[in-house]
Regions:
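Right-handed parallel beta-helix
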Residues: 9-13, 46-60, 78-92, 110-128, ...
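Ordered hydrophobic segments in well-structured contexts
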Residues: 71, 99-102, 115, 133, ...
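Short glycine/acidic-rich loop motifs that flank beta-strands on beta-rich extracellular proteins
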Residues: 18-22, 60-67, 90-99, 125-135, ...
Length: 190
């Protein structure tokens, strides 16, 4: 967190690979090791992170806390994803409210939407992302605006719904996207 605006631009030549053993990117303004700039950590207006022209592959958030977000976990600040690819990322395959093999978001600053533009999540057989819910995307209390993007071949691997039905582990909602919370909007265009 060295400044309010951070752009990571791979120029279409950079792949960030978790090797199938770790989450690739973690941004959490509520992490107790970081300095809060507001009374409520989720309301920090920074960092304002843009990820563009990157590939995120083989991220793995199974067994991690906070859960979900095999490639990217974001809480607070602002996040935008532009012209990027997410392939073969995973998080826990079972459980309620575990989601977002590619990207999991909680509370963006000012309740503004998280933008995804011209990006691909999965996109072809053998490249999909998989998690209990939201094979590609998952959000809690976050609105998404998804423009000209491909969310295909992703898997919501859980079963038993959310909350889980008796005798089931829960999950299985939203192969492409799983949102929950009281107030949010999902806008998909293109």
């Amino acid at each position: 967190n060295t400044g309010p605006v951070i752009v990571i631009d791979g120029a279409g030549r950079v792949t960030l690979d978790g090797g199938g053993v770790r989450r690739i990117l973690y941004m959490n303004t509520c992490d107790p090791e970081l300095v809060w700039t507001t009374d409520h950590c989720d309301d920090q207006d920074h960092p304002r992170l843009t990820l563009q022209n990157l590939t995120f592959a083989h991220g793995n958030a199974t067994g991690t806390a906070p859960d979900g977000g095999g490639a990217v976990f974001a809480r607070g600040g602002r996040l935008k994803v532009v012209n990027s690819r997410f392939e073969n990322n995973i998080c826990d395959p079972l459980g309620p409210d575990v989601g977002g093999a590619a990207l999991r978001a909680f509370d963006q600053s000012g309740d503004l939407p998280l933008y995804i533009v011209g990006s691909t999540f999965g996109g072809a057989p053998g490249r999909g992302n998989s998690c209990s819910n939201g094979g590609a995307l998952s959000a809690s209390g976050v609105s998404y605006t998804v423009l000209n993007s491909d969310l295909s071949y992703n898997d919501a691997a859980g079963n038993g719904a959310n909350p889980p039905q008796p005798g089931t582990p829960g999950g299985g909602s939203g192969g492409a996207n799983y949102n929950h919370g009281n107030t949010f909007h999902l806008t998909v265009c293109g």
